[in-house]
Amino acid sequence: MTVPATRKDLMIVNMGPHHPSMHGVLRLIVTLDGEDVIDCEPILGYLHRGMEKIAENRTIIQYLPYVTRWDYLATMFTEAITVNAPEELGNIQIPKRASYIRVIMLELSRIASHLLWLGPFMADIGAQTPFFYISRERELLYDLFEAVTGMRMMHNYFRIGGVAADLPHGWIDKCLDFCDYSLTGVAEYQKLITRNPIFLERVEGVGIIGGEEAINWGLSGPMLRASGIQWDLRKVDHYECYDELDWEVQWQKEGDSLARYLVRIGEMTESIKIIQQALEGIPGGPYENLEVRRFDRARDSEWNYFEYRFISKKPSPTFELSKQELYVRVEAPKGELGIFLIGDNSVFPWRWKIRSPGFINLQILPQLVKRMKLADIMTILGSIDIIMGEVDR
């Protein structure tokens, strides 16, 4: 930490790692001159579990339950990126219905993540009521997830070549009802929060990031779009079936905490529009590419002249990851979630590098909080939207 040696009466304060506003186990060492922040040093690693190393000793299917523990509030995105990488390496085709189901699940997960960002963010800056409001919608969302995947969180639903199960009978109608209800809920949030003078006083002009600065820091997601850069990987990379649906990229040009709030609120509305279109246009057909289930190599499967693979239960696919390098990415709620994968003609990846958006977006925090007030740290940190599971991995 760089503290000017000439300054006297500076106070060094630890915020976290068990402060309720730290959104996990983040620790900030803050140097204060009265109420003014002179310096801030984030200390990471309290939730490090060696996720990248674990991946090197697991097949893709064996590794799927682990990835839901990165960003545990938006687990569909970590699953999507985990299956997209081997799909591209193996040139595996996805059935149209599976692609639509994936988009529906991804956007529902985006809404869930933004809801659980909004409640604690408002609580951080002194507004308790919205936290109870978002719990209402979130419970309905988790009921939808539970009906399809069997789990309210940590869904383990995506598979290489499709999804684990089809949508149950009557689920589409329930989801359409949820979309109609959510639109009124988002309008309620805007009426309750957006024009609130106390809220505006806390967020307007706080934590400003310019467009060029955001690009130089490698920011992504709402952090980047709130600074006037219209960059959304759903439009840029054309993955899944997003091109077949009508929706707009949400962005603001002010670059402050209010702009980041407005981008996320707008994204919730756009996600509802995407889900409604996908539900109405979802095609029939298979939900999984069953060709993936075959073994690539049937040799050496005998033991005492007995084919053990025929009596085993639904085996995990053991196709090899070819010897090449690949970077795949999706637009997660917090930004660009990517994986750099190196295959080595083995069932295990040789290298599995995770590019988590929260880790990169967090790097700009010390610069944003300098010369601000102590109370503004909560506002700025909350507007970045971090989950320590994906920051520390």
From Swiss-Prot:
Known role: NDH shuttles electrons from NAD(P)H:plastoquinone, via FMN and iron-sulfur (Fe-S) centers, to quinones in the photosynthetic chain and possibly in a chloroplast respiratory chain. The immediate electron acceptor for the enzyme in this species is believed to be plastoquinone. Couples the redox reaction to proton translocation, and thus conserves the redox energy in a proton gradient.
Organism annotation:
Illicium oligandrum
Reaction equation(s) it catalyzes: a plastoquinone + NADH + (n+1) H(+)(in) = a plastoquinol + NAD(+) + n H(+)(out); a plastoquinone + NADPH + (n+1) H(+)(in) = a plastoquinol + NADP(+) + n H(+)(out)
What keywords are annotated for this sequence in UniProt?
Answer: Chloroplast, Membrane, NAD, NADP, Plastid, Plastoquinone, Quinone, Thylakoid, Translocase, Transport
Does this UniProt record's set of keywords contain Ribosomal protein? no
The record's similarity note reads: Belongs to the complex I 49 kDa subunit family.
Membrane topology classification = Peripheral membrane protein
Which E.C. number(s) belong to this protein? 7.1.1.-
Q: What protein does this entry describe?
A: NAD(P)H-quinone oxidoreductase subunit H, chloroplastic
Disulfides per UniProt = none
Q: What molecular function does GO assign, one term?
A: quinone binding
Write out the GO cellular component annotations. chloroplast thylakoid membrane
**Subunit annotation:** NDH is composed of at least 16 different subunits, 5 of which are encoded in the nucleus.
InterPro entries the UniProt entry points to: NADH_Q_OxRdtase_suD, NADH_UbQ_OxRdtase_49kDa_CS, NDH1_su_D/H, NiFe-Hase_large
GO BP annotation list: photosynthesis, light reaction
EC primary class: translocase
Transmembrane residue ranges:
none
Q: Where in the cell is it found?
A: Plastid, Chloroplast thylakoid membrane
